[in-house]
């Protein structure tokens, strides 16, 4: 299996890539039936041309790319909805209907710029599924915690632990 992870340098992406590498390299033997041949890491600094190559070859997409703390609220829609649109259009261009999982947030239920951008990305993914028949999954993260977590940035748990 070839897996594309977008947002691979972010907190969740970095942790996922490490877990996938452990599975691929047989350091984690909890899923013996899962065979990972390649992990395509794509982030904001990756050569843009590689997205097309990765979308042509991948068997599963974890879209973890997004914007959560922009300087301007307009960046939410560009980073969360805009990139999801580019990703799905690129998969369509290659006729690749592999499963796609998109990371979202419980904020998607709220009417604020961040929530609206996450909800727009979710809706786009559902439209993509209807159009292509691809299996899609939305995971709304309520809170995150783990290796590389930063207090006062991306985790209430890390902030709490830091403050005691």
Q: Which stretches of residues belong to each language-model region?
A:
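Adenosine-cofactor binding site in Rossmann-like domains, unifying the SAM/SAH pocket
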Residues: 25-53
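Short-chain dehydrogenase/reductase
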Residues: 10, 77-81, 111-119, 150-155
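SDR active-site strand-loop-helix element
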Residues: 6, 61-65, 100-105, 139-141
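Active-site segment of SDR-like NAD(P)-dependent oxidoreductases
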Residues: 68, 106-109, 142-149
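NAD(P)H-binding glycine-rich loop region in Rossmannoid oxidoreductase-like domains
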Residues: 43-86, 90-94, 107-111
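NAD(P)-dependent short-chain dehydrogenase/reductase
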Residues: 126-138, 142-164
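N-terminal Rossmann NAD(P)H-binding glycine-rich loop of SDR-like oxidoreductase domains
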Residues: 1-26
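Conserved Rossmann-fold NAD(P)-dependent oxidoreductase catalytic core, especially the SDR/UDP-sugar
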Residues: 85-139
